């Protein structure tokens, strides 16, 4: 799939509408647009985390793959489901979710069991991965809202992908804290120093 952008602004959205992949026009507040915009924001958050660098090139490669997947999720969410499409649309497949689950299992196997909730923080990379995780959680909620608003026209697989992705980002945020997790100490268990 080749993308050619010769001009960034078109003025076609100045009336509060935008075009979906099938060239139909919808309000910029349409649930599908909100969902793929949230995917875009999640991608930017992952990009910010990647900009810090990571000594493990495998994790960098995983995050780059996820960035590409998020573009695929956006393409899926912006392409209404129709019978017999003229061109086969780009869709999130179960294999994307399976790949995330494989990474979840592999990276989680090397981490200690949790004894409390984890606070976002620790290393800068870990903190940014937590930011990305929370944006992905919002994108997931937006994707489910799009499914609810357009039950026959939006696939559930992008929402499922985003659900699993937030799990992986949580795991990777823990991996990115080599000195250990920053754990929540409930109520009376904490004192300011």
Swiss-Prot record:
Its EC number is 2.5.1.17. The keyword ATP-binding applies. Gene3D superfamilies: Cobalamin adenosyltransferase-like (1.20.1200.10). It is found in: Cytoplasm. InterPro entries: CblAdoTrfase-like, CblAdoTrfase-like_sf, PduO-typ. Coiled coil: none annotated. Belongs to the Cob(I)alamin adenosyltransferase family. This is Corrinoid adenosyltransferase.
């Amino acid at each position: 799939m080749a993308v050619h952008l010769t001009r960034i602004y078109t003025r076609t959205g100045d009336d509060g509408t935008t075009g979906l992949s099938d060239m139909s026009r919808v309000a910029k507040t349409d649930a599908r647009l909100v969902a793929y915009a949230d995917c875009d924001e999640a991608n930017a958050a992952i990009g910010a985390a990647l900009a810090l660098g990571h000594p493990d090139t495998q994790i960098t490669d995983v995050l780059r793959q996820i960035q590409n997947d998020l573009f695929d999720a956006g393409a899926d969410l912006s392409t209404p489901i129709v019978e017999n499409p003229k061109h086969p649309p780009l869709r999130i497949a179960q294999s994307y979710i399976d790949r995330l689950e494989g990474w979840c299992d592999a990276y989680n196997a090397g981490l200690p069991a949790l004894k409390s909730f984890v606070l976002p923080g620790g290393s800068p990379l870990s903190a940014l991965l937590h930011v990305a995780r929370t944006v992905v959680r919002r994108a997931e909620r937006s994707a489910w809202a799009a499914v609810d608003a357009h039950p026959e026209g939006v696939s559930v697989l992008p929402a499922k992908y985003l659900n699993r992705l937030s799990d992986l980002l949580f795991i990777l945020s823990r991996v990115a804290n080599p000195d250990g997790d920053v754990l929540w100490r409930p109520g009376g268990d904490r004192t300011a120093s």
